[in-house]
């Protein structure tokens, strides 16, 4: 009987492993990413084994079948500063002094934070990191995909990276990476960027079906909305950003600031008290179509010098001569919008590299994204690709095509700006909404006890 039970248990584990393989295939600029390929799926026993498996050079399919909690190594009575943006005390964000001069002349204070968040988990080549059901959580650390290639991250929740502190940690950081697919990931409660691309170019990245949840008790804009959402400052990056849900934010959603190309379609932006797009630098091209903007204070920051083609009802036909199809207009409800249709973006669009995509009619986008973006929803959507670049008819059921492209840019940090936060928070914001409950354990803005010290800090994500 014991033997039979063992066989049944082993069979169940094998079935779970098979079912936890990557679902669907990457589309867009990230097409062709295979991750760990046919490696046998395996679940690490603990955080130490997860850390080891992620960083090695072996092709792996790593199952995240539970919560991996990296919290517990606190830095107490450590140096922080109070930036000008924090006008609301404990409801705002102070900043960790990380040794790059960012704090400048801001008033100093002491604070308690968790050391784990400051440096992400290194990810080596040929990895698939796949959550099982809705159980896959990485708490306290992000993923650092630097100088590597062929990585898939799917169906996990990354959360609680010192959300009360600027410089508390980045959820997903790319730098000099290629062939990366980030899919069905939820990110919440981070101190700094939810997604950032770093100094060296990360060529082909797909970012699809993800939920970026900015609900927070500690807001740099003092309104319960997370400011640091996406920062992309790398040159020559090609990004297809599709089917994502970005909500309860107040800025940098995204900020794109170096010559690169983003194709942004079928995303749902909701409840942004500041600005969504900040296209900062000349040579940057952002093509925005078929998205829903709902309750967005400003869809675009007017200060940037990059090129934007945002499709509205007056520019839908413009794509025909360049792309051979009609563009899909964006939808805006209770959102500030200035028409921007720089046709140089279409001329620069590397459609042959993006490959085949399917774009939903805009009236289907919000419902589709809410049903499919984030963790535990793989069976609902599948991440698949279509056979041709096309517009799905409005009567069709909103199913993601079998291979739709999504890619992320790489970032090159600008010079440190002491007053960067203050400068980017000039938009007035409403009263603070009811925030998300405090997670398992967080530090305080001020502290007078303890003797721990922060780890050596390596700034690899961004500096402004």
UniProtKB/Swiss-Prot annotation:
This protein's species is Emericella nidulans (strain FGSC A4 / ATCC 38163 / CBS 112.46 / NRRL 194 / M139)
Name any one Pfam family assigned in the record. Pectate_lyase_4
Which GO terms are recorded in the biological process aspect for this UniProt protein?
cell wall organization; pectin catabolic process
Catalytic residues (positions): 252
The protein's annotated catalytic reaction(s) are:
Eliminative cleavage of (1->4)-alpha-D-galacturonan methyl ester to give oligosaccharides with 4-deoxy-6-O-methyl-alpha-D-galact-4-enuronosyl groups at their non-reducing ends
Query: Mind listing the UniProt keywords for this protein, alphabetically?
Result: Carbohydrate metabolism, Cell wall biogenesis/degradation, Disulfide bond, Glycoprotein, Lyase, Polysaccharide degradation, Secreted, Signal
Name this polypeptide is given: Probable pectin lyase F
What are the glycosylated positions? 126
Q: Which family does it belong to?
A: Belongs to the polysaccharide lyase 1 family.
Enzyme class (EC, first level): lyase
Where it sits in the cell: the answer is: Secreted
């Amino acid at each position: 009987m014991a033997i039979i039970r063992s066989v049944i248990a082993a069979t169940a584990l094998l079935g779970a492993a098979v079912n936890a393989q990557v679902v669907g295939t990457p589309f867009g600029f990230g097409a062709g990413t295979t991750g760990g390929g046919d490696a046998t799926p395996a679940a690490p026993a603990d955080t130490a084994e997860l850390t080891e498996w992620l960083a090695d050079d072996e092709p792996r399919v790593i199952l995240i079948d539970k919560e991996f909690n990296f919290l517990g190594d606190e830095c107490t009575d450590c140096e922080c500063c109070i930036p000008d943006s924090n006008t609301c005390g404990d409801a705002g964000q102070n900043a960790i002094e990380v040794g790059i001069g960012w704090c400048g002349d801001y008033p100093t204070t002491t604070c308690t934070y968790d050391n784990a968040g400051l440096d992400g988990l290194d990810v080596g080549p040929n990895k698939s990191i796949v959550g099982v059901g809705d159980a896959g959580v990485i708490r306290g650390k992000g993923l650092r995909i630097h100088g590597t290639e062929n990585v898939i991250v799917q169906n996990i929740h990354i959360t609680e990276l010192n959300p009360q502190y600027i410089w508390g940690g980045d959820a997903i950081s790319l730098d000099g990476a290629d062939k990366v697919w980030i899919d069905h990931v939820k990110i919440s409660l981070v101190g700094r960027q939810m997604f950032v691309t770093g100094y060296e170019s990360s060529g082909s990245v797909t970012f699809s079906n993800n939920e970026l949840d900015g609900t927070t008790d500690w807001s740099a804009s003092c309104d319960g909305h997370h400011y640091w959402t996406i920062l992309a400052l790398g040159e020559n990056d090609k990004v297809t950003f599709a089917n994502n849900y970005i909500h309860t934010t107040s800025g940098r959603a995204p900020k794109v600031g170096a010559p690169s190309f983003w194709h942004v379609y079928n995303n749902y932006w909701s409840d942004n008290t500041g600005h969504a797009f900040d296209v900062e630098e000349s040579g940057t091209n952002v093509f925005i179509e078929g998205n829903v903007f709902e309750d967005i204070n400003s869809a675009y920051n007017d200060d940037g010098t990059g090129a934007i083609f945002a499709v509205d009802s007056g520019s839908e036909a413009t794509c025909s001569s360049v792309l051979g199809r009609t563009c899909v207009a964006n939808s805006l409800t209770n959102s500030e919008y200035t028409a921007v249709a720089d046709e140089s973006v279409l001329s620069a669009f590397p459609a042959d590299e993006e490959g085949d995509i399917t774009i939903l009619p805009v009236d289907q986008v919000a419902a589709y994204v809410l049903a499919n973006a984030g963790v535990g929803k793989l069976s609902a959507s599948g991440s698949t690709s279509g056979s041709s670049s096309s517009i799905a008819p409005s009567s069709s059921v909103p199913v993601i095509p079998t291979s739709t492209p999504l890619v992320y840019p790489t970032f090159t940090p600008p010079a440190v700006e002491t007053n960067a936060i203050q400068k980017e928070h000039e938009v007035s914001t409403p009263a603070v909404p009811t925030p998300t409950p405090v997670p398992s354990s967080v530090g305080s803005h001020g502290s007078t006890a303890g003797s721990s010290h922060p780890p050596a800090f390596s700034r690899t994500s961004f500096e402004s």
